[in-house]
């Protein structure tokens, strides 16, 4: 566990208010929503080293390119193959600690001001905040902890009985339908007294199902009317007038 002074972007977790007439949940995607662009490749470079990471990406150039074009299962499979090439045999505990160091070093400079302001608004209002991402669970856990979120849902990675990662998924990549399923399960586990009001923030087509089930969905993408989430209201610096 690292010991250091809190950075300016870190947020203290705010307990839920007993005075809230109806429970409110805010779900945030991570890459491209809370942060500028993707972070998984940077994370892999930090964990495995730049040379090994670029070499693995070169060997897997064809499936990675096909996955980028086709998205969906092709992208999921290519990502898993890259994880297996770079993470297999590594200590899960060590990768978790390395992830914490990576977040402390890199997250602050990549956070998007509007999204961070909205997350803080939800926390200050006593809402329950959860980060839902296709990034590895151990990585998302650290981000959620640093930002003060109440929950973290990410892609779970398999490990052997000795605690060494295989690099493969434990379940499915947390995007699209899986992201929605995991979020629904998390809501059910909270045992709210009534169905909560849901705010959801995303930036890509992998977030569409999550936004579709939200009471208040927001598009945090940079493409605006050209993006895949153009039907949804844009995230602005002004707090919403509801909830």
Name each model feature, range by range.
Residues 65-92, 156-160:
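Short, compositionally biased "basic patch" segments
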Residues 10-71:
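Active-site neighborhood of HAD-like aspartate-dependent phosphohydrolases
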Residues 34, 89, 176-180:
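Electropositive phosphate-/nucleotide-binding environments in soluble metabolic enzymes
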Residues 78-113:
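Metal-dependent phosphoesterase signature
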Residues 35-39, 60, 77-78, 90, ...:
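Generic alpha-helix structural propensity
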